[in-house]
Amino acid sequence: MDGNVFPDQEQLLAFLKKLKEVFDVCDEDADGYIRVEHFVDLGLQFGQGDEVKKFAKYLDPNAHGRINFKDFCHGVFAIKGCEEILKSALGTPTIAAQPYQTDNGYYYQHQEGSLGPPIIVCTRPYPECQLYSDEEGMGGRDMQESDMDSAADSGAGSESSEGGRQDDKEEGLGGFFLRGNNCGQMVSSAAASVISVEEQFEDYGEGEDVDFTPSSPIPDDDTRTNGFSDLGSSLPSSAGQTPQKIRHLYNSELLDVYCSQCCKKVNLLNDLEARLKNLKANSPNRKISSTAFGRQLFHHSNFSSSQGSTEDLFRDSIDSCDVDITEKVSYLEKKISELENDSLANGDLKSKLKQENTQLVHRVHELEEQIKDQETRAEQCLEEELKRHREAYSKMERDKSTEIELLSNRVQQLEEENAEMKVNVCRLKSQTEKLDQEKQRMTDKLEDTSLRLKDEMDLYRKMMDKLWQNRHEFQKEREAMQELIEDLRRELEHLQLFKLETEKPGRGRTAAGLSEYNAKTREIELEHEVKRLKQENHKLRDQNDDLNGQILSLSLYEAKNLFACHTKAQSLAAEIDNASRDELVDALKEQEEINFRLRQYMDKIILAILDHNPSILEIKH
């Protein structure tokens, strides 16, 4: 932005359209107003409470409780610090109306509440001056605009379409807030604000002044073209407008009056400006351009003319126009003479600078010779340093080759030792594998022996149970035999008594009784023999039990020893990876001794089984 003028009306129009979309989203009832409570509720979803309340105060300064679109736009521009842009574009009456005067005697005037375009009044009462106002209708204005279009047809034809587009943009901006006749007021106010801001002159260096070339040799056209060329050259280019665009803005409905007599003085000013340009182009130290200087004079006259009221300016304009132009011409002639004197002084300065330049050239030549001498000495020193570095480098190469040879010999020796260690490791690995296999085989044998021992223990337990049963049966048989013997003894006594009784009455049955007595005696002897045999059997059984107990105790003792050796073998197997070769050999010998003892124990068990119960070794299906 430049000042208070938005650089592009299309951008302002697009921004207002976006604000309208936001306004429609917040307008929940679609009645053209936003309730402040609803707006605060929406704002609390995206910001803090204090900031939302301050924003609502900006949008509703009068605390009406609702916000229309105009207040919404003014609040947004006020928060962004750009409220003056909206006011200037919409013709808001914030600044008092002030007249503006140009060098050719025109006054630009826009007042508050004016419904038509601003009026330009000529200060010189010539009969060629024609005044048109809004009360006379559009007839005179159409004639005047046709004259201006014919004068600027060849040089500014393309800018006329841009002026039309600008008017359309301004009408679009006004249409956001006003309807009907108010739109015309907004357009005229916006155009007047553009003119008022464009007359704020700034110096941006030299620029090109583009003059119109008339398409026909009519005197009025020439004077009009020059007059508009002066207007275009006296406006700044910093606001994004070229002189042709500004002239087209003046050719639009902002210019209602044109004075051909006033342009004669303008032609004189243009000649003086041309002389100033030539002097400035030839001057070695240019400070300010002629166009910028003319702008400063125009701004000074504009500022001085804006101090009085509109009525005083109209009253004094006729008397002061000639005096002001004469003073300006004299002032410009004085400045031209001063610039010519400055040009002469600059010529003397130029000759002096040439002499100093000659002296400096000689000094440069001397310094170049000194530099050549220094370069020669530097090359000699460089050659000496290179020679010294080559010698040092050759010595380092020799030392390096010797060290590399020693290191290669050491590496070869280490490789041989490494190969020997690899062979030893392979051999030890093979021995370790063999020992592991032997250990596994002995472990399997020990497991088999343990299983067989378990079977023998089960068999012994069964035999003991069977022996106990036999003893119990024998005891029962013995008791039954004793009872039988007692019965036989009682029967024998009874028979003896019967025999005695029978002998007493007669001796006829003596032979039969004797034979019966002998049978009884033989029976008693047999009973005694059975009793004796049973006692011997009982003794043999006791001896068998004692022998079986001894065998069992011996087997348990041997099993304990074998289990202890097996545990030791397991611990040895756990340490076999960290043991040395001698330790492995000792462990192997100890394992072989354990295996030999285990074989002897197995042989003893087999012999004992063959002696006492060979049926155990029989294979049963």
UniProtKB/Swiss-Prot annotation:
FIP-RBD domain location is: 558-620
Q: Report residue spans for region: Disordered.
A: 132-172, 203-243
Low complexity bias located where? 151-161
Report where it is expressed, by tissue.
Answer: Isoform 1 is predominantly expressed in neural tissues. Isoform B is expressed ubiquitously. In the developing retina, it is expressed in progenitors throughout the retina at early stages and becomes restricted to the ganglion cell layer and ciliary marginal zone as differentiation proceeds.
Task: State one Pfam family annotation.
Answer: Rab11-FIP3
What Gene Ontology cellular component terms go with this record?
cleavage furrow; endocytic vesicle; endosome; midbody; recycling endosome membrane
The UniProt subunit note reads as follows: Homodimer. Forms a complex with Rab11 (rab11a or rab11b) and arf6.
Q: Can you say what this protein is called?
A: Rab11 family-interacting protein 4A
Per the UniProt record, the source organism is: Danio rerio (Zebrafish)
The lineage, from the top, is: Eukaryota, Metazoa, Chordata, Craniata, Vertebrata
